[in-house]
Amino acid sequence: MNEKRVILVIEDERTISNFICRALHASDYKAIAASSGKEGLSLFFSHQPDLVLLDLGLPDMDGTQVLSQLSGLPNEAPVIVISARDRESEKVKALDMGADDYVVK
C-alpha cells in the first residue's frame, strides 16, 4: 500500500486553509495546516512534506522569510506560493527566492 503524499498548507485565513485541506483530503493527500510562519517551519521539519503551499501574508513573519528558510535545504520540497499579492514584482521576488510557482488567490 502506498503512503499518502504529505502537503503542508501555511495559511493564516482559516476558511481558506480548511477549504484547501478538505480538497486535498478528498484527493487522497495528507494535508497538514499551519496558521503562522513559525508553526509552518516547525511542521516542515517534523513532517518532511512532499509539497508546501505558502501564503505570503502571515501574522508573525512574511511568507518570503519562510521561503528563504526553506530554500536550499537538502530535503527541499517544492513550494507553491498562494497569495493575494498580485503585483508582478511580488511574483518575481518569490520565484527568485526559490518558489516553484505563484498563484494569485
Model-derived regions: residue spans:
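Active-site residues of response regulator receiver
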Residues: 55, 83
